[in-house]
Amino acid sequence: MKIQDYTKQMVDEKSFIDMAYTLLNDKGETMNLYDIIDEFRALGDYEYEEIENRVVQFYTDLNTDGRFLNVGENLWGLRDWYSVDDIEEKIAPTIQKFDILDADDEEDQNLKLLGEDEMDDDDDIPAQTDDQEELNDPEDEQVEEEINHSDIVIEEDEDELDEDEEVFEDEEDFND
């Protein structure tokens, strides 16, 4: 059945991903995502607000369903239309090449390294601003006496002690 023959009830019941497969199969060419959504909206006589939730799921399905291929610029087609070599070419990431620097290059004063541009812009930032406190602020409270480690008491739960003893006993049984 062709996509143009769908009734509103059929559009309501069918998933957008299945309708997209039928639509692309009927058209035989790649389509922009927004054009696909506009086709669905027209078929079901929907307002944008009515299908907003379905569009989110549809986009997720497009990316995860193996039948579809994003061929760039938000254009979608069917994977069946492309050979393996075409698919690898269309979805292969482009790698930006960088020159490898040697010792002479590092000494070159005219050479800008990645990230140096951003550092130059930060030169006018003061080391301390008015809203910062000094570390040696006289208003800070002085600690009169330090706490001695022998004064610290740590309370342990009896349940934790029992578990530790059981683990220790299990280890002794294991070693026997």
UniProtKB/Swiss-Prot annotation:
An MF annotation (GO) of this entry: DNA-directed RNA polymerase activity
Gene name in the database record: rpoE
Taxonomic source organism: Staphylococcus aureus (strain NCTC 8325 / PS 47)
Keyword Transcription belongs to the record: yes
Disulphide bonds in the chain: none
Name of the protein in its database record: Probable DNA-directed RNA polymerase subunit delta
Function: Participates in both the initiation and recycling phases of transcription. In the presence of the delta subunit, RNAP displays an increased specificity of transcription, a decreased affinity for nucleic acids, and an increased efficiency of RNA synthesis because of enhanced recycling.
Disordered as annotated region, ranges: 114-176
Domain of life: Bacteria
Keyword set includes Transferase: yes
